[in-house]
Regions:
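Bacterial N-terminal signal peptides that target proteins for export
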Residues: 1-12
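A periodicity- and composition-biased signal for non-globular, repetitive helical segments
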Residues: 12-13, 47
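Bacterial signal peptide processing site
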Residues: 25-27
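C-terminal motif of bacterial Sec signal peptides marking the signal peptidase cleavage site
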Residues: 19-23
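Solvent-exposed, non-transmembrane regions of membrane-associated and secreted proteins
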Residues: 29-295
């Protein structure tokens, strides 16, 4: 009988030990998880860092949209329409007009009808005959009609989204297409500067001399001065090479960041890319910590 009791007590003791081990907390079991963690590290399954994710995204490519059909249909309704402008994820997606002056379309839409918000209109001095004959500085204007710089407003109020670094990073290109019979008229422009400025900075210069347009368009040196001025004022330092030999696109609107001053503008500048350029999903940029600011 005693032998049977001893065996029963021994069995009970073993059962208690098993239950005790199975009730350990996670803090009491770090060593049992360690081999699994080490195996994960060996297999390279660790989460990617933000830098690695950005580098991977920058290696991905995108395809430019085709805007020729929209332009063709719009031009059939108004011969003043010379192009179609689009920026991904913004309301900026519409016809661009050009008149014999820069005032005709201030309060007209692209169909020539009255509109407080106007439309996108190109400077009357710009040339749009073909890709090869484009002006060195193609300037397009649009209204910002909200005195609070509401970036969700109409027309070029939307450009103010580029004041947000993450948005700027995710939107490296502007698409601007002109009338033409081949793919060369469908153009992609890579942004290299986003800035606030006063009109003292002559960033909209197209010809050498305003008084004598017959002298022709600005020189490479004059364009380079505009580019440098834009980069000095830019909210970001873009990793985009641009020179006076390039053709640039200038999108300009009013800004009320500094109150209701009439001389402040918000500008997005981009350079024309080659037809076979590879397009990436992100821009490489950093904050410009010593930018020239509006005074």
């Amino acid at each position: 009988m005693k032998g049977i009791l001893k065996k029963a007590m021994a069995a009970a003791l073993v059962a208690v030990m098993v239950l005790s081990m199975s009730g350990c907390t996670e803090e009491e079991q770090p060593q049992t998880n360690q081999p699994q963690q080490e195996q994960q590290q060996d297999d390279g399954q660790q989460p990617e860092t933000q830098q690695e994710q950005e580098e991977q995204s920058q290696q991905q490519t995108v395809t430019a949209p085709s805007l020729s059909q929209q332009l063709k249909e719009a031009k059939a309704k108004n011969d003043d329409i010379i192009g179609w402008l689009k920026i991904d994820d913004l309301k900026v997606d519409g016809a661009v007009v050009q008149a014999e002056n820069n005032t005709k379309y201030e309060r007209l839409n692209e169909w020539g009808q009255y509109s407080w918000t106007g439309t996108y209109f190109a400077d009357y001095e710009c040339n749009f005959d073909s890709r090869g004959s484009l002006s060195k500085n193609t300037v397009i204007y649009g209204h910002n009609v909200d005195f609070n710089d509401n970036r969700d407003g109409e027309r070029f109020s939307q450009l103010l989204y580029f004041a947000d670094e993450e948005f700027a990073k995710q939107h490296p290109y502007v698409y601007f297409t002109i009338d033409g019979d081949d793919k060369s008229s469908e153009m992609v422009w890579e942004i290299f500067s986003v800035f606030y400025t006063t009109t003292d900075f002559d960033y909209i210069r197209i010809n050498k001399d305003y008084r004598n347009p017959q002298e022709g368009e600005i020189t490479d040196a004059q364009l380079m001065n505009i580019i440098k001025g834009a980069q000095e004022r830019s909210e970001y330092d873009y990793e985009v090479e641009v020179s006076g030999e390039d053709k640039i696109l200038t999108l300009s609107t009013c800004s009320y960041k500094y109150g209701r001053r009439k001389d402040v503008r918000f500008v997005v500048m981009a350079k024309l890319l080659d037809e076979d350029a590879v397009l990436h999903t992100q821009a490489k940029l950093t904050q410009n910590t010593d930018k020239k600011t509006v005074e």
